[in-house]
Amino acid sequence: MFAAGYAYSNQYNSMRDYLYDEQIRDGEVFKCAEQDQRLVHLSAFQSCLSKEESALRIFEIAPREYVKDKYLFEQCGVTREDVVEFQQQVKPLCQNVYFNAHSIWDEIKDWPFVKMVESNEWLCNSIIHRIDGIVALPIASNFILSFSGDCLSIPFICKWITNKEGKMSLNDITSRFNSVFGTTFNRSVIAEKLRSSGMWSQIITDEIDGYIDSLADNSNFDVDSLLDEEFF
């Protein structure tokens, strides 16, 4: 029995048993968006998914869509050993502080494993995420990876970009961020994260007052309320 009014039968010894017997079935794609949201938002369910992904027993083939290992292996003609070998081969490419499959795609796109999984960038990213020691920041239709969670945030990633390439306009940092990591941010999200972190002047060449004025001119919302919004 769990909070939020959700329970599984006592015939199951664990959430993992319930997950495998009742949810992620052989030959089917488990889509979180189509499930009872009371279930998919349970911390126990999320924890179970994460553990099974780390053990390479289930795979995320698209955002919040999962299949069992057997399904992936049969559909793509790969083995568990192929997945582990891919992780071992790709790890040396993950030398930047921040990375994901998109940021190294030019280097891996012609690998046999990548072609066998039909160049599924999301799947490759989720497999890379499960390399020991890597943590993830889910954002804007993708997720960014790092071996250090201490500075894994949008402002620090922007600072990392400008440390290498110099300060930029808000439009340019938004474009560069999306280009490197395959994200879909609009500039208002980047702006709010930089403003609230106090790192605007370290990264952006535009004056922050001018940006706030432009919001006031183009929005029917209260500016303070808009800037206080939590996006993630």
Spans of features found by a protein language model:
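C-terminal non-catalytic scaffold/interaction domains in large multidomain proteins
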Residues: 1-232
